[in-house]
């Protein structure tokens, strides 16, 4: 972890407009994934403020007020922390800041994605920076009522279903 933190600190200064907050919801202690994502985003020129593990809702809210981020990213690895991520997502809706999220629990239990009002970043960490860049560039909607990101398979099935309806 110390080496990863050193790499993050050595990343070049931000070259892109906007700010991203990244951390873990209350009770989530797993930090390797969020640290890796922080590193990947900083290497791509983003200003990322890493909040760390177990971020209380009141701290998240005050940090949002101060930093005015374009996107908040939260990571949950366990079922009970997916529930705390859901609570955090409701706060983000109230303050109208878009949420992106990911983590092992959403890969293992894909139906959970339907419950989280935000953008699922996908099952592979290395693909997340491109998804995040698209979300920031398009000004993602902070009032999403359910998980919206589709996998390639979902898109193909949806296209096939649409084609069947038209045919």
Q: Which residues does each predicted region cover?
A:
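Short, charged, surface-exposed secondary-structure boundary motifs
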Residues: 110-111, 129-136
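Generic alpha-helical secondary structure signal
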Residues: 58, 83-86, 111, 126, ...
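Short beta-strand elements of ligand-binding domains
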Residues: 98-104
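Short, ordered loop/turn segments at secondary-structure junctions
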Residues: 53, 77, 104-106, 125-126
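Glycine-rich, charge-decorated loop segments at or immediately adjacent to ligand/cofactor-binding or catalytic sites
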Residues: 106-118
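Core of compact, soluble alpha-helical bundle domains
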Residues: 133-167
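Short acidic-hydrophobic, aromatic-tinged amphipathic segments that line or gate anion-handling sites
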Residues: 119-128
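Conserved mid-sequence domains
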Residues: 1-98
